[in-house]
């Protein structure tokens, strides 16, 4: 049985004051013990969040890590080892905003996935297609290519300590959401691709849906057989909304 997971990606948001207020609001939420909950603050707030999550059922991750592990001459980058030293457990890898805006290729994403695990973090590998690719009927092709790069480079065994998030790019921050059936089709294809290498591992990998997940659509999405939770963007900055999404995953 796969444990549901809800992950909150705070993106480039927050001040010290607003982050403290948000975590304090989380404390007042009735969060289901059956659901694994993680938040991904900006680098500048990771330490602050780690300092105040004691007593809150939330683990902490980073939104990115360097493509090399360890320490060394890579100005401006933060390694998985440094994030683990702070107390992080998770890291997002391959988010569409980094693929599209910052030009991260499938090869770079695969390197970051490997570096994350080498440093002791559990990666959340983000996959997803643009609106143009969906309208061209290429959704499954694009997602299979993105996943295939990591599978080929790192092997299916690497996914025993990783999570995959499907985020259709056209649904991120747009208010648009894939229907539960559209999302399930892609999630099933992802699990099938993993199963061609190892069915047991494939059955154990948690697959999250991201892309305008809200309290009013979460339950319908999470009811799908291969959707094990959500990667939540804007709604994770509202404690009541995020709490409701977590409770939907627990049901």
Swiss-Prot record:
Protein name listed in UniProt: Triosephosphate isomerase
A GO CC annotation recorded here is: cytosol
Kindly list the places in or outside the cell where this protein is found, as annotated in its UniProt entry.
Cytoplasm
The GO terms this record gives for MF are: triose-phosphate isomerase activity
Domain of life here? Bacteria
* A Pfam family per the record: TIM
Give the protein's biological function: Involved in the gluconeogenesis. Catalyzes stereospecifically the conversion of dihydroxyacetone phosphate (DHAP) to D-glyceraldehyde-3-phosphate (G3P).
Task: Provide the active-site residues from the annotation.
Answer: 95, 167
The top EC class is isomerase
Pathway(s) per entry: Carbohydrate biosynthesis; gluconeogenesis; Carbohydrate degradation; glycolysis; D-glyceraldehyde 3-phosphate from glycerone phosphate: step 1/1
Specify the species: Stutzerimonas stutzeri (strain A1501) (Pseudomonas stutzeri)
What UniProt keywords are attached to this protein's entry? Cytoplasm, Gluconeogenesis, Glycolysis, Isomerase
Under Enzyme Commission nomenclature, its number is 5.3.1.1
